[in-house]
A protein has these predicted regions:
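Short N-terminal strand-loop motif that marks the start
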Residues: 1-72, 134
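Cofactor-binding loop segments of dinucleotide-utilizing enzymes, especially the Rossmann-like FAD-
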Residues: 18, 42, 78, 184, ...
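Glycine-rich beta-strand-centered segment in the early N-terminal region that forms part
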Residues: 30-44, 57-105, 147-149
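Cysteine-cluster motifs in flexible loop/terminal segments that predominantly coordinate metals
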Residues: 47, 94-144
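Glycine/charged-rich beta-loop-alpha catalytic/anionic-binding loops adjacent to active sites
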Residues: 142-152
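Mid-domain Rossmann-like dinucleotide-binding core that forms the NAD(H)/NADP(H) cofactor-binding site
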Residues: 150-219
Length: 219
């Protein structure tokens, strides 16, 4: 595999060392392969999995965890065999999938047989996606172009929104159908807004007053 030399040698990233304890660490930037891209991160949203592990509710995922996977940024370098992407493109991160197994080839990347990166250690002893970083090296299959006008924080929702759209397609939602969404957390709201965009009549259930008010503010 051809190795691409880049000027940037180090990356800084957020690391969850244990429940409620975070640190900023430095590591060598991984060497780029011919199908990889180097991204300068603009934003990385905090997913429920990240927050849950910070609170100690997902300690089974293990520590130290270099979390963050709902991000967006700007391409700074491309591998020699990367197609469709150029330096300066704004991109969002996608789900980490191998692209080779039967599930990936059938369009079910969310069920990838080799994507459980949370259970894998990097060569220097960390777990995770390294999204909470200034720079990332990722396979080009893990990114998608975004409009230049789209705010970076909104672009970071591409990965969870893709999950929602997949689910809406699986239930074959149709305009004017009544759909019930249980819970007005982040994913519940994304489901409700997506179903509304599909033309469905949405009933959203929630017991927490602050989440109810938040849902109302979004229409």
């Amino acid at each position: 595999m051809e190795v691409i030399t880049v000027e940037i040698k180090k990356m800084h990233f957020g690391l969850l060392t244990r429940k409620g304890k975070t640190e900023i660490r430095e590591r060598e930037l991984p060497k780029m392969g011919e199908f990889d891209v180097l991204i300068k991160q603009e934003t990385c949203n905090i997913c429920t999995t990240d927050y849950g592990q910070f609170l100690g509710l997902r300690e089974h995922q293990g520590y130290p965890m270099a979390g963050g996977h709902e991000g967006s940024g700007i391409i700074k370098e491309v591998g020699s065999k990367v197609k469709g992407y150029n330096i300066g493109d704004r991109v969002a991160l996608l789900y980490d999938a191998c692209g080779r197994c039967d599930m990936c080839k059938s369009g079910q990347e969310g069920r990838c047989a080799d994507a459980d990166i949370l259970d894998k250690f990097s060569e220097d002893g960390y777990k995770g996606f390294f999204g909470f970083a200034d720079y990332m090296v990722v396979p080009s299959r893990r990114i998608a172009k975004i409009n230049k006008e789209l705010p970076s924080a909104e672009a970071g929702f591409l990965e969870p929104l893709a999950t929602v759209v997949k689910g809406v397609k699986l239930v074959k939602a149709k305009p004017n159908e009544t759909m019930v969404v249980i819970g007005a957390g982040t994913m519940g709201l994304l489901n409700a807004l997506t179903l509304k965009a599909y033309g469905c009549k949405v009933i959203l259930t929630e017991s927490f007053e602050n989440k109810i008010e938040n849902a109302k503010s979004l229409g």
